[in-house]
Amino acid sequence: MPASTAPQAPPAPPAQAQAQAPAQAQEAPAPQRSRGADTRALTQVLFGELKGLAPGTPEHDRVRAALIEANLPLVRYAAARFRSRNEPMEDVVQVGTIGLINAIDRFDPERGVQFPTFAMPTVVGEIKRYFRDNVRTVHVPRRLHELWVQVNSATEDLTTAFGRSPTTAEIAERLRITEEEVLSCIEAGRSYHATSLEAAQEGDGLPGLLDRLGYEDPALDGVEHRDLVRHLLVQLPEREQRILLLRYYSNLTQSQISAELGVSQMHVSRLLARSFQRLRSANRIDA
């Protein structure tokens, strides 16, 4: 009987093939751009298509619907800022989508502004109007209302005396109250109306209080808006640069920034508001 032969191993692949195999395995998942970059690229293409279509036509409606769908993450991002209001998030997203649609209908790609930068103020504005019209105001105790008048007066006097905004401790010492009472007064004013800044402007809030408190400027949300902040930083005084860095890169609240810098939260609010105005002017952000 012929001797049995052991099974032979398959021939080894050529050295070149062996060298290529790891490279091919590494290249299998092609590098993907970030989701945000993909959305911006798709949005740009869709606006290019939309420009050549007559409004009201089926094709125009199809492209417009695709734009809405592609940019819904922007609405959800904006809506998430209002989670503390205890409203159903689905309702807030629906309201924000109305703002998104309005922004799409008004957007002009030739202005050279990124669509998220243009749309965010409209989306957030629509959500704030919803809360203004549908959320009940919070009752502020009379004592806090009266205390605010004293805090406001003391702040003005100390600002004149020191040539700067006073700290919370300095206000408390002037009025012979605790720092906690000063902060309670400020927080009561913040919650007096669901849309703090709008309420004050419309004469609905505590006299002057909410004008002095900070507000979150929608133009600075997201990575695109941080890029705008970075561009603006070189134009700002050193203290405003630091406050913006703490707020939008370190993600500190206004209260935390005031503690970090040893100034009142009202002063932080004013500096942020001043920086926001410069940002809007420099970049022509449509609010």
From Swiss-Prot:
One of its GO terms (molecular function) is DNA binding. SUPFAM superfamilies: Sigma2 domain of RNA polymerase sigma factors, Sigma3 and sigma4 domains of RNA polymerase sigma factors. CDD domains: Sigma70_r4 (cd06171). It comes from the Bacteria. Residues 15-32 have a biased composition (Low complexity). InterPro entries: RNA_pol_sigma-70_dom (IPR014284), RNA_pol_sigma-B/F/G (IPR014322), RNA_pol_sigma70 (IPR000943), RNA_pol_sigma70_r2 (IPR007627), RNA_pol_sigma70_r3 (IPR007624), RNA_pol_sigma70_r4 (IPR007630), RNA_pol_sigma_r2 (IPR013325), RNA_pol_sigma_r3/r4-like (IPR013324). A motif (Polymerase core binding) lies at residues 91-104. Transmembrane segments: none annotated. Keywords: DNA-binding, Sigma factor, Transcription, Transcription regulation. Residues 1-37 are annotated as: Disordered. Gene3D superfamilies: 1.20.120.1810, Winged helix-like DNA-binding domain superfamily/Winged helix DNA-binding domain (1.10.10.10). Residues 254-273 bind DNA. Sigma factors are initiation factors that promote the attachment of RNA polymerase to specific initiation sites and are then released. This sigma factor is required for normal spore maturation. Belongs to the sigma-70 factor family. SigB subfamily. NCBIfam families: SigBFG, sigma70-ECF. This is RNA polymerase sigma-F factor.
